[in-house]
């Protein structure tokens, strides 16, 4: 067993053995037609919150809207959004960098505007 100081640095098996989606796959999910489908999923009782509260950037399901809003304020979410603002490389750029193929004009990467997610009102339950 590692001591207390070493235990903090070990990666849990869940994180190590079940990696999430790659950034290019998340970029595909951010396209408007696919994002709309992910945000309006059918009810799935196996997922947290029945699959209704999903963060596309972090590919996580949440129990309720309040938890998802709290997640959006965290450093983890903000860093993921910052990482996703970079445009992914295309196959043509990769071939040109590797020396095979020709890419006429390599420009600086520009920022991608992420689609704004619709505000879903939180229903207020009257206390009796």
UniProtKB/Swiss-Prot annotation:
In Swiss-Prot or TrEMBL terms, this protein is called Zinc finger protein 593 homolog
Where it sits in the cell: the answer is:
Nucleus; Cytoplasm
Q: Which Gene3D superfamilies match?
A: Classic Zinc Finger
Keywords attached to this Swiss-Prot or TrEMBL record, sorted alphabetically, are: Cytoplasm, Metal-binding, Nucleus, Ribosome biogenesis, Zinc, Zinc-finger
Q: Which InterPro entries would you find in this protein's record?
A: C2H2-ZF_Maturation_Protein, Znf_C2H2_jaz, Znf_C2H2_sf, Znf_C2H2_type
**What highest taxon heads this organism's lineage?**
Eukaryota
Q: Which intervals carry biased composition (Basic and acidic residues)?
A: 20-29
**Subunit architecture:** Associates with pre-60S ribosomal particles; released from the pre-60S particle very early in the cytoplasm.
Q: Which GO terms describe its biological process?
A: ribosome biogenesis
Compositionally biased spans, kind Basic residues: 1-19
- A cellular-component GO term for this protein: nucleus
Q: Does the keyword Zinc apply?
A: yes
**Zn finger (C2H2-type) start-end:** 53-77
């Amino acid at each position: 067993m590692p001591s207390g100081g070493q235990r903090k640095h070990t990666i849990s098996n869940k994180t190590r053995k079940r990696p999430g989606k790659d950034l290019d796959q998340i970029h595909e999910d951010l396209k408007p037609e696919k994002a709309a489908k992910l945000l309006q999923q059918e009810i799935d009782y196996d997922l947290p919150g029945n699959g209704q509260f999903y963060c596309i950037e972090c590919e996580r399901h949440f129990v309720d809207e309040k938890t998802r809003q709290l997640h959006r304020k965290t450093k983890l979410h903000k860093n993921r959004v910052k990482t996703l603002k970079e445009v992914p490389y295309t196959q043509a750029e990769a071939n040109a960098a590797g020396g095979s193929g020709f890419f006429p004009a390599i420009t600086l990467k520009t920022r991608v505007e992420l689609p704004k997610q619709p505000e879903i009102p939180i229903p207020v339950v009257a206390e009796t």
